């Protein structure tokens, strides 16, 4: 008698792959076909830059020194102190390293732990639309429901305002996840927009989960401002989430951090201690070296991304019925393709099938993203040059 698989829990029924993972499955299928054109990917948020040498050296030194035992699950003291130093230095925020900082295995787990600590079964979580789709599964795993906040394209950028937040609110809303710089659209929320968010959260007693992972990658006079620094009253109802993946090209290191009021951080610690535990000890040593060490590498990376951004905007300029939305931050640019009168997913598929370039269709990020394409410049050099050539050719062919 053949053994059958054990029954699976219903809590997984609402989970689905992220847009990037779903497209990767299509890419693998395409590449398995005989005679398929090799593809160039302008899809993923995976920097092609290397982790700076002094950070790598801190890790290897920790390994040589035998720093391979279980870590402090709250975060090793040097890392928590480096996080507190960084937040005061860069964001003007003071947190107690002992009670208000938590180290995590990447920012995504920090968001999951925050949701587990903040929302009950059936609670609603607000997400600005277009939505970074990796937020959706942690909300569902925590028993929550997603409520989108409609954004609008205004002045060449996506924006949200207090009216949109109010329109999305209901008595079941418990939290808002805010991402600035905003993946996928590249908007850096300004002081006025953040003040509106703060007023809304305070008026409606909504907790703020502030995802600031792209904070170091901003352009053209659009500096990152943490919502917690804009409105001091927001601090007691907010948790700041960040990681080292983008700022220091450390995606594979899987290390992030959270900062917030001590009771919330303690609750998040309980989630972490019973699941992922903390990042490896030697990884934490490298992270502390990154945050507390020289920051020249951050400036150099930002300058490199700025040059790539200009390359994207220049190469895709002047295509009839296509308009680029220049990003304020991050390493994604949105192409407004509403003038082509085709669904964004159809355009994406044509670009891959007929022109050998992979991007993400805006509709993958919610109804607010329909009519756009997300173009990544996390990779540069020949990959970016060839990809942009193919993208220009493919978009022109859709006319």
Listing of model-derived features with the role each one plays in the protein:
Residues 2-106, 113, 290-293, 398-399:
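N-terminal small-domain helix-loop-helix segment of the aminotransferase-like
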Residues 262, 279-295, 300-301:
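Structural motif of enzymes handling amino- and sulfur-group chemistry
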Residues 288, 304-313, 324-337:
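Conserved glycine-rich beta-strand-loop-beta hairpin in the small C-terminal domain of fold type I
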Residues 268-273, 291-313, 344:
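Structural signature of PLP-dependent enzymes
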Residues 30, 34, 142, 203-204, ...:
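Helix C-cap/helix->beta junction micro-motif
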Residues 166-167, 341-343, 350-359, 365-399:
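PLP-dependent enzyme catalytic core of the Aspartate aminotransferase-like
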Residues 67-199, 216-217, 224-232, 390:
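Conserved core of the PLP fold type I
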Residues 230-267, 279:
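Active-site PLP attachment segment
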């Amino acid at each position: 008698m053949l053994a059958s698989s054990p029954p699976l829990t219903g809590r997984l029924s609402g989970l689905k792959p992220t847009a990037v993972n779903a497209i990767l499955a299509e890419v693998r299928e395409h590449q398995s076909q005989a005679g398929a054109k090799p593809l160039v990917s302008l899809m993923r948020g995976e920097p092609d830059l290397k982790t700076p040498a002094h950070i790598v050296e801190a890790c290897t030194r920790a390994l040589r020194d035998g720093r391979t035992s279980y870590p402090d699950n709250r975060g090793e003291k040097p890392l928590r102190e480096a996080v507190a130093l960084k937040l005061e230095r860069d964001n003007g925020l003071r947190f107690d390293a002992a009670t208000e900082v938590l180290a995590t295995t990447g920012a995504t787990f920090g968001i999951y732990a925050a949701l587990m600590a903040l929302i009950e079964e059936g609670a609603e979580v607000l997400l600005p639309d277009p939505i970074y789709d990796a937020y959706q599964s942690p909300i569902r795993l925590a028993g929550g429901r997603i409520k989108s906040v409609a954004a609008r394209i205004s002045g060449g950028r996506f924006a949200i305002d207090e009216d949109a937040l109010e329109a999305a609110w209901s008595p079941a809303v418990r939290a808002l996840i805010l991402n600035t710089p905003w993946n996928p659209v590249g908007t850096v929320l300004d002081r006025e927009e953040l003040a509106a968010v703060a007023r809304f959260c305070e008026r409606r007693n909504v907790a703020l989960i502030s995802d600031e992972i792209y904070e170091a990658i901003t352009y053209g006079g659009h500096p990152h401002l943490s919502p917690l620094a804009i409105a001091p009253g927001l601090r007691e109802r907010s948790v700041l989430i960040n990681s080292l993946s983008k700022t220091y090209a450390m995606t594979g290191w899987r290390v992030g951090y959270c900062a917030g009021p001590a009771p919330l951080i303690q609750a998040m610690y309980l989630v972490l201690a019973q699941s992922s535990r903390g990042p490896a000890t030697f990884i934490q040593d490298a992270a502390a070296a990154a945050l507390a060490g020289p920051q020249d590498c951050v400036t150099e990376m930002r300058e490199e991304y700025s040059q790539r951004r200009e390359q994207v905007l220049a190469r895709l300029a002047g295509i009839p019925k296509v308009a680029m939305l220049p990003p304020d931050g991050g390493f994604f640019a949105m192409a407004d393709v509403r003038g082509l009168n085709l669904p964004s997913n159809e355009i994406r598929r044509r670009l891959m099938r007929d022109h050998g370039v992979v991007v993400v269709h805006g509709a993958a990020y919610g109804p607010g993203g329909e009519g756009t394409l997300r173009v990544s410049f996390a990779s540069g050099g020949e990959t970016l040059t060839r990809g942009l050539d193919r993208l220009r050719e493919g978009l022109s062919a859709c006319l």
